[in-house]
Every structure is written in C-alpha cells, then in structure tokens.
Amino acid sequence: MLRCLYHWHRPVLNRRWSRLCLPKQYLFTMKLQSPEFQSLFTEGLKSLTELFVKENHELRIAGGAVRDLLNGVKPQDIDFATTATPTQMKEMFQSAGIRMINNRGEKHGTITARLHEENFEITTLRIDVTTDGRHAEVEFTTDWQKDAERRDLTINSMFLGFDGTLFDYFNGYEDLKNKKVRFVGHAKQRIQEDYLRILRYFRFYGRIVDKPGDHDPETLEAIAENAKGLAGISGERIWVELKKILVGNHVNHLIHLIYDLDVAPYIGLPANASLEEFDKVSKNVDGFSPKPVTLLASLFKVQDDVTKLDLRLKIAKEEKNLGLFIVKNRKDLIKATDSSDPLKPYQDFIIDSREPDATTRVCELLKYQGEHCLLKEMQQWSIPPFPVSGHDIRKVGISSGKEIGALLQQLREQWKKSGYQMEKDELLSYIKKT
C-alpha cells in the first residue's frame, strides 16, 4: 500500500548560517516495503534501531542508499543519520557495551559502531555554518530538513525510516522517477559550497538519466561560471569522481560537455584534446568494461599529457603506466594485417615485457583499438614458459655470463619465430649449429 502525506514548512533564517534555509512548501512521504528494503534488517541493524528507539533518538537511512532502494537496488553501503550528537552516541554505545571503531570521523559528526560483525556509520544531522568551496564548518542540529538542505542533489537528499516511511523535502523522489538530476535549491550556491559537486553532477547524470541531452540551463550556466573553482580541489578527490564518470553511461556526451563548459583545464585534462579520437574510442570500448585510463588516454596526443594528468590528479602508478603504454603503442603496436596470426605482435610484446601486468595492458589496448575478436583470443591465451634457462646453456659447455645472456636472447627470438613451439632440445641444438 502506498500512502502520501504533505506537511507545510516555513522558511527559517539564521544570521549565523552561511545561507538561507531553502523554502520548501511540502514534505512528501510514502511507505516503502520492497524486498530490497526488508533484506537490510540483519541482526546488527535490528539491534541498532532498537537501541536508538530505547534512548529516544531518531535514526534514519540517508542519501544514496535511499536512492538505490527507491530504484529497486539493494545498496552496497548504507549511511545513517541521527538526531543524537556524537557525544550522546558514544555514551549510548558505551553503556550498551558496543564497540566503536574508526574514530577519525568523529570531528565530522560520524560514529562507527560495530554490532554482530557489521559496521554502521552514523552521522549527526548537520547544517553548514561556513563553506570555502572545499570544506564546511558544521553545526549539529535535530532538524531533518536543514540537513537535507546541505546535500548536493535532490535525489541524494532523502531519508528513510525503518518503518518504510520516506522523507523527501525537495522532490527527490519525483526527480528520480523522471530521471532528472537537479541540485537542491540553486545550483550556483550548491556548487560554490563545494566545487567538486560539478563532477558529482556529471557522475550522477550518467547514472540516473536514460537519454543524454536534457540539462537545466541554470545548472549548465552555474557550472560554466564556477568551473575554475575546481582548481582548488585536491587531485585525489577529482580522480575519484572522474573515474566514475568514465565508466558510467553517456560518457561521450559528458566529456564533450566538460570541454564545452571549460571544466577540462581545471581537472588535468589537456586543452588540445583529440575529441574525434575520443568519440571513436568510446564506441570501440562500449560494452567491454574498459579501465578509466583506457578511455581517458584517447584525449592525450603525447605521453607528456599523461604525466601532466598524474601531476594534477595523483593517479596510481599502474594507472599512469597504462596511460603511457596506450599512448605509446596505440599506433605502433597494431595487428599485422598481412600476417596469418594477427595476435602475434601482441603476444610477442607480452613475452618480451616479462612484466606481471603486461597481459592486462595489452587487453586494454585491444579494447582501445576496437579489436574485439583479438581481445577474446588474448583473454583465453596463457603465456607459455620459455623452456631454456642459463643452467641448460652451462650444461653444453658455455660458462661466460655475458655469452649466456646473449645466447638466451637469440634462443628467445627463435622460440618466438616458431610461435612458441620449439622445445628445449630443439633450442639447445640451435646453439650447437651456431
């Protein structure tokens, strides 16, 4: 059964706040009783909710987990919000003999409790007192609407009670049904509170919207006006969001938008990017689960572009190496169309590389090039062991280390030419012939 209720809310002004409380005419509520919601009630969660009821503190599911449940998806991570302060939560958990972990979140109002081998992250309701585009000074509150106001998008501003009651202050449920991504209140204001919200908008657009192209003009204008604010955001935070954009839906549309709105230079992307190459590669990799750097490499013309990206975003070493590899080899290491075995150049590269991630890199390159048949073959291919060692060569009477090294290299080339078929005896007999 679905029940909807509406409640009148009056706008509130507090001079200490950095912004005006957003006026919201109605609070929309409904009952959710889906299998995904019911599956959340583990022994740990039951114990947690019982404790909060006993201590007269409100506790609700918050943010992304609510969005997922409304979409019929069981959330992987659940954030909880409460009217209890961190001090009250600590006293409550200590009295109940419940262990608390990860105390680093306490200064932000988050306490992590461990019940029945599960961790529960619970954050006190907050209002932003001041913001600087990166961080916020917060004050605790017991007002659920005020906490909802400080969140980025309407679809992330909802709460869910444990009786299944949805609390929606800013039409998040309606936006979710209509596949609409909107900021809570004014886009410009939300963005200026934390400029990373520009990338979060793009990320959730790729996640929520069915067909690309429908954006509020006010939102795009606010992004373009405030894109330079991303220059002050740490590279690590930007990379987390950008990676999710690259592996999400509508990536072609979103990357073009990032360039059209002049966001690119502030997040480490090259000004002279090859968007035509990006368009081609985005089609090549569609449906083949590329790594984020694989698609991103199509924007880079030279390896130095990868190095500059790393300086800005502090990407992982293996990600940087993959980007350098693709930019270097996307044209040089290509299938030999006149060869009876077009996979051979790629296999030879892996054999010569002797690096543990060489096969992964080559598979990503094949995705980039759109060589889907070769990719399937490569994924089924196992690297054959080279059958000759330095010890084998010593047995035939050669003791010089330098000579042994040179012979091993010659034998490896012969073995490669044979399609990795020559066996030890054949290779050792080759030494005697030479």
From Swiss-Prot:
The modification Phosphoserine is found at residue 400. Mg(2+) binds at residues 77, 79. It comes from the Eukaryota. Its EC number is 2.7.7.72. Changing residue 326 to A: Decreased CCA tRNA nucleotidyltransferase activity; abolished homodimerization and disulfide bond formation. It is found in: Mitochondrion; Cytoplasm; Nucleus. One of its GO terms (molecular function) is tRNA binding. ATP binds at residues 64, 67, 151, 194, 197, 200, 203. The record marks 193 as: Involved in nucleotide selection. The modification N6-acetyllysine is found at residue 402. GO terms for biological process: mitochondrial tRNA 3'-end processing; rescue of stalled ribosome; tRNA 3'-end processing; tRNA 3'-terminal CCA addition; tRNA surveillance. GO terms for cellular component: cytosol; mitochondrial matrix; mitochondrion; nucleoplasm; nucleus. Belongs to the tRNA nucleotidyltransferase/poly(A) polymerase family. Nucleotidyltransferase that catalyzes the addition and repair of the essential 3'-terminal CCA sequence in tRNAs, which is necessary for the attachment of amino acids to the 3' terminus of tRNA molecules, using CTP and ATP as substrates. tRNA 3'-terminal CCA addition is required both for tRNA processing and repair. Promotes tRNA repair and recycling downstream of the ribosome-associated quality control (RQC) pathway by mediating addition of the tRNA 3'-terminal CCA following cleavage by ANKZF1 and repair by ELAC1. Monomer, and homodimer; disulfide-linked. This is CCA tRNA nucleotidyltransferase 1, mitochondrial. It comes from Homo sapiens (Human). The gene is TRNT1.
